[in-house]
Amino acid sequence: MEPSWILLAAGLVLVLLVVAWVLRSRARRAATSVPPAAPPGRVVAPGERLRRGLAATRQRLTAPLESVFGRAGGDVERTLGELEEVLVGADVGVATAGALVARVRERVPSGAEASAVRRAVREEMCELLAGTPAPAPSSKPWVVLVMGVNGVGKTTTIGKLAALHRQSGRRVLLVAADTFRAAASDQLAVWAERVGADLVRQRPGSDPAAVVFDGLQAAKARAIDVVLVDTAGRLHTRTNLMEELRKLRRVIAREVPGAPHETLLVLDATTGQNAVAQARTFSEAATVTGVVLTKLDGTARGGVAIAVRREIGAPLQYVGLGEGVEDLRPFDARDFVDALFGGEADA
């Protein structure tokens, strides 16, 4: 009997070692998706950070705009025609560029100098992009539903939003309702540990609505201030996606009257006009209250922000300008336009 017990104990130890190794490997894989904290150094002002993030887009616009606005004389129609072509080339989109130019045409008299047209363009962009900032939580729990296709940085954005709320002293709970992608749950777990947030998740393949229900029950029991709900991003199954989002919203509204208080759509700026198509599809499935535009620092397609705003009407509320936690910034229309054009408004 004694040898049998020894073998049994050895086998049990081996199993435990294997399980520990698997869990550690999964945690390491998830951790690679979490950006590092900013290195020590001087604090970069939000406007400067945005200017750096839009450098590629600005570089793409600078030479064509100088050609358009640097000309002497008052041929407004020629200036506007060339301006429209430049805007389309910056991923503002054909329809949005045309509408923007039409509004500028109404603001400037015929024979106006190119500098006057430039000022009018800036003002029209500011007015188009202006919107309400993300609201401060005013009830408890404050529920935020976050949508977006896989690969846009949705789960990372949720982690960074959690960090922002934690910096404001709020208790945060993350709900891993993207049960079709195991890595999403693991990644949220790493973020929860990193920023000091609670986490509710179930095994892969679970019913997302059940996960949300459990999360809201936990939020009420633990006196959580903010609940951030991750969702699946399977845009290729459009009908199922819409129905799933509607179901999640019904569960949320039933458990927390008036919720979701925010419905954020995360879009990847590097995808250009594809981001506009995604925005259109998601806005059909749920009312979008705000847009998060990620990866602005890695693309020359920053003009897509203007196209998305006009397409679905929802305000841009955050922009992603890098990998660090501090690189998710509240959106400011004036700062954005200044960064896009490369300086303060013309005198």
Question: What residues fall within each predicted segment?
Answer:
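Feature marks short, highly hydrophobic, charge-poor N-terminal signal-anchor/signal peptide-like helices
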Residues: 1-12
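Short beta-alpha junctions and helix-cap segments that line functional grooves
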Residues: 3, 19-20, 161, 277-279, ...
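Cytosolic-side junction of a single-pass transmembrane alpha-helix
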Residues: 16-31
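Short juxtamembrane segments adjacent to a transmembrane helix
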Residues: 27-52
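Primarily NTPase-proximal linker/entry elements flanking Walker-type ATP/GTP-binding cores
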Residues: 43-229, 244, 254
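Conserved catalytic-core segment of NTP-binding enzymes
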Residues: 187, 204-222, 236-345
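Short glycine-rich anion-binding loops that position phosphate/pyrophosphate groups of nucleotides
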Residues: 232-234
